[in-house]
């Protein structure tokens, strides 16, 4: 029987900032409680949606510690802890574990474009440095290189704590290969809200979602409906929220979703450069959709 540890609806959590660019710890705690109440399965701080490239190592540790303490065992915390320098990625992973994370999300090295063997050795060093489960994050659109299915499967077979992949390549052939060839206890999660329905229908385990920031209970409902084969319900939810899924990327993530959360009164609308606020035109479009969905 499968004992997959990483599954269901996971939120790629935003990092709330104050106007002076410091971390808004009160808003951060509020977000954690929001997801506990909504039934979100996994909360992921310090990922791309959390503006991790703009966070110092100390800030990442502090955020993970706050989220873990606020979660208090009621929700799994899988902390973003990746970068493109292997030694630094190992350090971030160790710090995330020390800060209380139940698991780690580690992005494939970006910019330096390693070979597949380089990818393997990168994640080998991380896996050997920590004891918590690791989610390997494949996002070629941001990293510039694809972590192949064969390399992901090799890692999954060789290291017991490499427990899952967040697959955001949009390559359906690669996704199918992972789902068909994976070890029994290895989870395959999509990183695309637009693909939840087909991904779950193919046998996927869940989603690491941007839209779960705004509509956590709905995303979980969609995942469950698709997983259980309730396709009429899943199609209806997908049809209703598809525009929002798309609009969350009308400009660079997490700018649109943070604007939405500010409309919902959850956070202040603040970003760290080089991210800047939405254009007025896109604000109007997104606000109209939020009103249409009854979210504000």
From Swiss-Prot:
It is an enzyme of class 4 (lyase). Its EC number is 4.3.3.7. Pfam families: DHDPS (PF00701). The active site is at residues 137, 166. It catalyses: L-aspartate 4-semialdehyde + pyruvate = (2S,4S)-4-hydroxy-2,3,4,5-tetrahydrodipicolinate + H2O + H(+). One of its GO terms (molecular function) is 4-hydroxy-tetrahydrodipicolinate synthase activity. Pyruvate binds at residues 49, 208. GO terms for biological process: diaminopimelate biosynthetic process; lysine biosynthetic process via diaminopimelate. It comes from the Bacteria. The record marks 48, 111 as: Part of a proton relay during catalysis. Pathway: Amino-acid biosynthesis; L-lysine biosynthesis via DAP pathway; (S)-tetrahydrodipicolinate from L-aspartate: step 3/4. Keywords: Amino-acid biosynthesis, Cytoplasm, Diaminopimelate biosynthesis, Lyase, Lysine biosynthesis, Schiff base. Its main location: cytoplasm. GO terms for cellular component: cytosol. SMART domains: DHDPS. InterPro entries: Aldolase_TIM, DapA, DapA-like, Schiff_base-form_aldolases_AS. It is found in: Cytoplasm. PANTHER family: 4-HYDROXY-2-OXOGLUTARATE ALDOLASE, MITOCHONDRIAL, DIHYDRODIPICOLINATE SYNTHASE. Belongs to the DapA family. Catalyzes the condensation of (S)-aspartate-beta-semialdehyde [(S)-ASA] and pyruvate to 4-hydroxy-tetrahydrodipicolinate (HTPA). Homotetramer; dimer of dimers. This is 4-hydroxy-tetrahydrodipicolinate synthase.
